[in-house]
């Protein structure tokens, strides 16, 4: 019986301030820990239980992610009784059905490819997330009536801005090329504008207001001294790939920032460094946005 939790019906309302927990177990009499890995019990009082705080990362695929290890280390280091899971789903609707059924969910991070796809499922957005048009942090709140309220935020812009700011030289870095047009690029564009840098998208297809890789002439490369890779090109396991920019036109005045952090030095960075450019990966951004996400989960 060591791996069985007995819930006596007369004790179901042990948590009047947390009706969502009581409701989640109202139909139970006996359940196994295998079904509820986040349950904690008191050995001498089988009717008393609580659910650990649950956090996680939504995305697909998640093989490249450091987030689960980052938060596991944080919980152990700071003695936080919580769990961080990878929610790896190839379908956003199925993913949200799963997440919204978790009674102990406090919040979750969002990564590729769901930073925009998750937005229709949210109850509200922070002003910054709304302005950016992408969400990478979701805060979950359970109402007294058992309803789950999901609030979308964006900590990518904080992580990116705080990470790149020390490397910027205002007299040189006035314009930026942003490679890729996904959810992360929206936060980068927003952050660059906030720092007074004029950003321009670069994509493989011609679109109004954007440059193509073929349009990166010597004049353009001389004018745009900051280049941010927001695409997954060069990410493990495809480490021999890099964005198709004219690396021979780079100079020591150029700053190349790669949101990819696995590998720690991408081919994009190596080729930039070979030309004397300043280079940086996205690992510090990951740490800073994760710290900001933690604050959002506990203040929203």
Locations of regions flagged by a protein language model:
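Short glycine-rich anion-binding loops that position phosphate/pyrophosphate groups of nucleotides
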Residues: 110-117, 184, 232-235, 262
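Short helix-loop-beta connector
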Residues: 169-174, 252
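Phosphate/diphosphate ligand-binding glycine-rich loop within oxidoreductases
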Residues: 53-167
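NAD(P)-binding Rossmann-fold cofactor-contacting core
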Residues: 195-211
């Amino acid at each position: 019986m060591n791996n069985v939790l007995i819930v006596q019906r007369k004790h179901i309302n042990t948590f009047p301030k947390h009706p969502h927990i009581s409701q989640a177990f109202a139909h139970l009499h006996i359940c196994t820990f295998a079904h509820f890995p986040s349950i904690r019990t008191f050995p001498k009082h089988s009717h008393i239980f609580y659910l650990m705080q649950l956090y996680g990362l939504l995305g697909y695929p998640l093989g490249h992610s450091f987030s689960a290890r980052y938060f596991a280390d944080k919980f152990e280091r700071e003695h936080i009784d919580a769990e961080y899971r990878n929610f790896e789903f190839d379908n956003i609707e199925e993913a949200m059905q799963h997440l919204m059924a978790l009674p102990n969910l406090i919040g979750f991070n969002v990564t590729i490819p769901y930073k925009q796809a998750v937005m229709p499922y949210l109850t509200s957005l922070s002003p910054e997330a709304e302005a950016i048009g992408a969400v990478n942090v979701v805060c979950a709140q359970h109402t007294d009536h058992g309803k789950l309220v999901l609030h979308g935020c964006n900590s990518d812009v904080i992580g990116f801005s705080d990470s790149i700011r020390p490397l910027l030289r205002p007299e040189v870095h006035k314009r930026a090329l942003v490679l890729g047009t996904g959810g992360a690029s929206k936060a980068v564009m927003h952050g660059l504008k906030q720092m007074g840098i004029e950003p321009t998208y670069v994509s493989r297809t011609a679109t109004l207001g954007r440059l193509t890789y073929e349009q990166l002439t010597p004049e353009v490369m001389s004018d745009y001294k900051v280049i941010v890779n927001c695409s997954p090109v060069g990410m493990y396991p495809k480490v021999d790939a890099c964005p198709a920019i004219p690396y021979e036109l780079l100079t020591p005045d150029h700053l190349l920032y790669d949101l990819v952090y696995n590998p720690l030095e991408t081919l994009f960075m190596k080729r930039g460094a070979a030309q004397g450019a300043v280079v940086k990966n996205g690992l510090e951004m990951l740490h800073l946005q994760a710290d900001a996400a933690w604050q959002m989960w506990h203040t929203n």
